[in-house]
């Protein structure tokens, strides 16, 4: 069981190598590339663990895998969306041990405390940050002393999120 394949027969088999066809740069949405670059630059986090709550932009996950050393945990309640991402990455040969896809509620997923160097809430609809409990849960996952959170909020939701994540409501928080 060491991964060796033995073939018994006459002559040498014809070997055919199937090269991996890289995704064309034209296929990558510039928005995803810019967003990933912006998140990595602003957070100054390029390795460790990232937890992505909600999967509104699959290419953001692709770009984070491609441009960082982050181990990424994605939590989303859409099983069809997660399976499609898993199949696409496996077909392309890009599904790696650096990526874990968890189908479940981003609000109550069983994620260990203090694991995330970076948390990205990419789908505010599936993981809305409109309650203090949700924000508190997010900070329970976040690594103390340097963990960063990036919440991509629709226009006008920033003030409500900041009211739940202000230094007065959560100890040690800087906004």
PLM segments and residue spans:
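Conserved SAM-binding strand-loop segment of SAM-dependent methyltransferases
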Residues: 93-106
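Glycine-rich helix-loop-beta junction characteristic of Rossmann-like nucleotide cofactor-binding loops
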Residues: 38-45, 109
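A short glycine-rich, Lys/Arg-flanked "PGG" loop and its adjoining helix->strand segment in the class I
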Residues: 128-148
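A short acidic, Gly/Pro-enriched loop at the edge of an enzyme's catalytic core
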Residues: 103-121
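Conserved Class I S-adenosyl-L-methionine
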Residues: 157-175
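Conserved class I S-adenosyl-L-methionine
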Residues: 44-65, 69-74
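Blade-level signature of beta-propeller repeat domains, shared across WD40, Kelch, NHL, RCC1
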Residues: 1-18
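Conserved SAM-binding loop
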Residues: 85-88
């Amino acid at each position: 069981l060491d991964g060796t394949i033995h073939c018994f027969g006459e002559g040498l088999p014809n070997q055919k190598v199937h090269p991996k066809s890289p995704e064309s740069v034209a296929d990558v949405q510039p928005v995803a590339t810019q967003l990933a670059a912006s998140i990595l630059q602003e957070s100054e986090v390029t390795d460790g663990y990232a937890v992505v709550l909600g999967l509104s932009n699959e290419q953001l996950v692709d770009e984070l895998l491609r441009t960082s050393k982050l181990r990424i945990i994605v939590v989303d309640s859409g099983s069809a969306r997660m399976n499609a991402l898993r199949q696409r990455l496996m077909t392309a040969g890009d599904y790696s041990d650096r990526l874990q896809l968890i189908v479940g509620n981003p609000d109550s997923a069983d994620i260990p405390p203090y694991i995330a160097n970076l948390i990205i809430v990419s789908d505010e609809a599936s993981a809305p940050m409109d309650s203090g409990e949700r924000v508190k849960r997010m900070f329970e996952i976040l690594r103390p002393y340097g963990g960063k959170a990036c919440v991509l909020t629709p226009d006008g939701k920033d003030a409500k999120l900041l009211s739940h994540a202000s230094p007065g409501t959560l100890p040690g928080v800087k906004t």
